[in-house]
Amino acid sequence: MTKSIQAIRGMSDTLPEEIPYWSFLENACRSVVSAYHYREIRFPVVEQTALFKRTIGEATDIVEKEMYTFTDRNGDSLTLRPEGTAGCVRAGIQNGLFYNQIQRLWYLGPMFRHERPQKGRYRQFYQLGVETYGMAGAPIEAELIFMCLRLWKALGLESCIHLELNTLGTLDSRNAYRQALVTYLQSREKELDEDSRRRLHTNPLRILDSKNPDLQPLLAEAPKLIDYLDETSRRHFDQLRSLLDQAEVPFIVNPTLVRGLDYYTHTVFEWVTDQLGAQGTVCAGGRYDNLVELLGGKSTPAAGFAAGLERLVLLLRGVQECLDKIDIYVVIAGEAVIQEGLLMTEQLRNVLPEWVIEADLSGSSLKSQFKRADKSGAKWALVIGEEEIKTNTVTLKHLRETVPQKSLTRDTLIPYLKSEG
């Protein structure tokens, strides 16, 4: 027997019963971002490897260990995008979107990272990305956070996701803090785990994000970034917190919060849940004013966020009822009337265009069809058999309430269904 081919590890299929949750989520994303007049942008899933090395940082885990990189037939090094911001900035520069313009953009699509797969973390994963360009200051950051909260409310998830904030300050203040942190950690290097020792010489801020419980006492005594902020950075962060307080958006200031990408400055934030174990971050973002210039564009203030759709779907499944709604399941009694049943079902769709109607064209027994009708979650079963064809009637059975079934003429069926909703 030929061995079957399996999906690549960490790249899963999305099956039909899961799609309604994805559709609900994607539609909510589009609705919320459009309400703020953000415009969609699309860019390739494959970019030059140099793009990510320059923006994400050579010493990050993403570039060192997680990127899907290959050499094409021309000898060029290409990479499947591990995140969307770098590609969005590249597209903006190449197409002149940032030249003396304010841009509010969004995108939705797959990203790729070679990580160890587990619940909520995959090698192909989908993100909603929201990016703003040309606006400095805290107000646009507050708008991004308001947008996130509005999305959680639209999804019914606001009670299980909370906001954490921090500031990385300007590059100058962050560099001063980085030196103080390195000096402190070097004095206690023997207490660091292997991964943190490596990061000490490459990306020391990431040590603050360690989940190793043995390191937490050491990190609690580490220098605090807030003590190294310049006055500009302090005012920026104070203004953001004031705006959130005025809008009654609850938040926690988390001084150990850093992002895994080198290009962040000033504000960083994460929306976190305690319902997904170790993969608790469902959305993350902040400000990255130096990124456009880093890629060869004109100095442009920028801020944005990315939300992980797989993790949001996991949360949705816990709070939303089945989203695969069927209004009518048409039971066709006997192979002799399948054609009549099919044509009548199509007529129903013409007059009830908003209703979801499924016709059983299997020709199987009534018992089997009613089992499928009940399992489908449909509200009504509409029975069409030889007797109904002869008398120009249908039999209507309510599948969710214990009420007598009804025999209706075709003329009275539509008004009755509309009245019952």
Curated annotation (Swiss-Prot):
GO terms for cellular component: cytoplasm. Pfam families: HGTP_anticodon, tRNA-synt_His. GO terms for biological process: histidyl-tRNA aminoacylation. InterPro entries: aa-tRNA-synth_II (IPR006195), aa-tRNA-synth_II/BPL/LPL (IPR045864), Anticodon-bd (IPR004154), Anticodon-bd_dom_sf (IPR036621), His-tRNA-ligase (IPR015807), HisRS-like_core (IPR041715), HisRS/HisZ (IPR004516), HisRS_anticodon (IPR033656). Its main location: cytoplasm. The keyword 4Fe-4S does not apply. It is an enzyme of class 6 (ligase). Keywords: Aminoacyl-tRNA synthetase, ATP-binding, Cytoplasm, Ligase, Nucleotide-binding, Protein biosynthesis. One of its GO terms (molecular function) is histidine-tRNA ligase activity. It catalyses: tRNA(His) + L-histidine + ATP = L-histidyl-tRNA(His) + AMP + diphosphate + H(+). It is found in: Cytoplasm. It comes from the Bacteria. PANTHER family: HISTIDINE--TRNA LIGASE, MITOCHONDRIAL-RELATED, HISTIDYL-TRNA SYNTHETASE. Belongs to the class-II aminoacyl-tRNA synthetase family. This is Histidine--tRNA ligase. The lineage of its organism: Bacteria, Pseudomonadati, Pseudomonadota, Gammaproteobacteria, Legionellales.
